[in-house]
């Protein structure tokens, strides 16, 4: 079946949305949230950042760096896939990339609160690894079964949200918008009150 779609740009864009979502969500968790936790636990932030303006500048700088990194990963992935399938990118491919960038910004800001959890670097790494695995598994399960608990979890599943938004003509549910709106507000508050002292310093 795959061989029948060589050179089919439209089919290819529909198939890669899940992978683009996985790559982008990985960057959000590990290049952004985990990095912020790591800088805090290493004592870097407490040593060099002493004001709320400094904290916001540090978080904003890491957000921009992670966004650039995610764009590079996505561009590389799409390039390799299109070359492998002998497909030519069109204007919709550019739109796909731009939409991915916009979703990444939303996800990074909305999930900033996770970096403020008072846990060690190793614990945060474990939490993020489990989280991305669960999100990916539930996303795969939803391809065959998307009822009950699986459906409700996938409403806020970041990878599923990427896939939904990258597909033309599909809209998010009001519950998704409400939940991520609340997460956005919580993340803004957590950025303003971001603790700079590492967890081990208070133990």
Where are these regions (language model features)?
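Long, highly hydrophobic alpha-helical transmembrane signal-anchor segments
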Residues: 1-11, 102-106
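Long, hydrophobic alpha-helical segments
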Residues: 14-34
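Short alpha-helical transmembrane interface motifs in multi-pass membrane proteins
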Residues: 25-30, 61, 91-99, 172-175
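Helix-loop-helix units of permease transmembrane domains in multi-pass membrane transporters
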Residues: 31, 35-67
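Alpha-helical transmembrane segments and their short interhelical loops
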Residues: 63-125
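Junction motif at the cytosolic side of a transmembrane helix
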Residues: 113-117, 178-203
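Transmembrane helix segments
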Residues: 118-153
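Short hydrophobic, aromatic-rich alpha-helical segments embedded in or entering the lipid bilayer
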Residues: 145-178
């Amino acid at each position: 079946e795959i061989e029948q779609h060589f050179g089919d740009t439209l089919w290819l864009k529909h198939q890669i949305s899940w992978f683009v979502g996985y790559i982008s969500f990985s960057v959000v968790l590990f290049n952004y949230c985990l990095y912020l936790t790591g800088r805090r636990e290493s004592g870097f932030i407490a040593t060099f950042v002493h004001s709320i303006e400094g904290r916001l500048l540090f978080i904003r700088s890491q957000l921009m760096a992670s966004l650039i990194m995610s764009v590079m990963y996505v561009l590389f992935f799409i390039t390799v896939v299109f070359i492998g399938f002998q497909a030519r990118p069109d204007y919709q491919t550019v739109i796909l990339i731009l939409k991915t960038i916009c979703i990444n910004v939303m996800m990074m800001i909305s999930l900033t609160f996770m970096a403020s959890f008072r846990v060690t670097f190793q614990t945060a790494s474990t939490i993020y690894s489990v989280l991305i695995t669960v999100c990916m598994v539930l996303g795969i399960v939803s391809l065959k079964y998307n009822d009950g608990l699986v459906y409700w979890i996938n409403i806020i599943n970041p990878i599923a949200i990427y896939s939904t938004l990258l597909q033309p003509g599909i809209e998010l549910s009001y519950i998704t918008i409400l939940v991520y709106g609340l997460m956005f507000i919580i993340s803004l508050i957590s950025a303003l009150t971001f603790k700079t002292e590492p967890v081990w310093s208070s133990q």
